């Protein structure tokens, strides 16, 4: 799958006239994509031309701290010949857009998959609007293309996606003919646990952050509970957000909730079975499915 014909020097992309295949690592700053980037920096994967992180502007501070650390490692002078630039792009502030009821283009939609009474769920547009599109726009910019310009036949892109073997069902082809999605961790036959083991061996004591928006409706009770106990300021911010999305806005006349129980987040009981005096016979495992 590796066909890197263009390499960068000193953190810059190669000259466009020499570039036929642009290798881009899609960086979610979660476990899999972080390990994928570090494996390249350690020489265990080919070197991509760049990595791109799409910022929703509402990630937990731990994600931004991790991204800063990751960037310092990957661009370190100690990694002679194995460094590559990390670009940060954004389509706007998903927190503000969700409250106002618009998406990144100003169209009136509830971009997050909020819950509503009557077993209704809003359309999930956030990944496409705030992750996929800004990365695609940056790729087109790196190819030297203007808005609406077609990708020349002599240029193509291989986009590295951090999906591991335990998530193989999430593998999808690119929607663009000029772009091919490739899955280095699948090729390496690495699971999420394998990624964690790789990271713990090389960076003992450092914790990999889970990458997801603070107020993602797909958070489970374990994650909400952890936020309430350990990041009270973030939890208070999300509670305030949850209250605001119940106010009618634009063309939405129904009440939305951030929690699947369809009750205010401030009133949800996140206690686990042990907290309630019962024995928990199961392990609740949270898997973030957005930023790998």
Residue ranges and their predicted role:
Residues 2-5, 13-292:
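Nucleotide-activated chemistry modules centered on ATP-dependent adenylation/adenylyltransferase
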């Amino acid at each position: 799958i590796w066909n890197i014909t263009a390499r960068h020097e000193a953190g810059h992309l190669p000259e466009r006239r020499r570039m036929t295949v642009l290798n881009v690592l899609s960086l979610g700053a979660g476990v899999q994509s972080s390990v994928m980037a570090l494996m390249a920096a350690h020489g265990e994967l080919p070197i991509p031309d760049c990595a791109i992180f799409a910022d929703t502007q509402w990630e937990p501070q731990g994600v931004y701290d991790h991204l800063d650390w990751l960037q310092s490692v990957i661009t370190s002078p100690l990694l002679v010949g194995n460094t590559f630039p990390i670009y940060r792009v954004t389509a706007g502030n998903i927190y503000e857009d969700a409250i106002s009821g618009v998406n990144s283009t100003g169209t009136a939609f509830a971009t997050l998959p909020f819950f509503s009474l009557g077993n209704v769920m809003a359309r999930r547009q956030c990944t496409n609007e705030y992750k996929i599109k800004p990365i695609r726009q940056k790729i087109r910019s790196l190819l030297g293309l203007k808005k609406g310009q077609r990708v020349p036949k002599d240029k193509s892109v291989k986009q590295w996606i951090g999906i591991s073997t335990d998530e193989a069902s999430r593998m999808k082809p690119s929607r663009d003919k000029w772009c091919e999605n490739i899955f280095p961790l699948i090729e390496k036959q690495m699971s999420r646990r394998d990624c964690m083991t790789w990271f713990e061996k090389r960076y003992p004591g450092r914790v990999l952050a889970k990458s997801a928006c603070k107020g993602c409706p797909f958070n489970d009770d374990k994650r909400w509970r952890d936020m309430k106990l350990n990041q009270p300021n973030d939890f208070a911010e999300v509670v305030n957000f949850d209250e605001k999305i119940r106010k009618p806005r634009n063309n939405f006349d129904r009440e939305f909730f951030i929690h699947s129980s369809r009750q205010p987040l401030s009133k949800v009981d996140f206690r686990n079975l042990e907290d309630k005096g019962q024995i928990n016979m199961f392990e609740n495992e949270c898997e973030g499915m957005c930023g790998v």
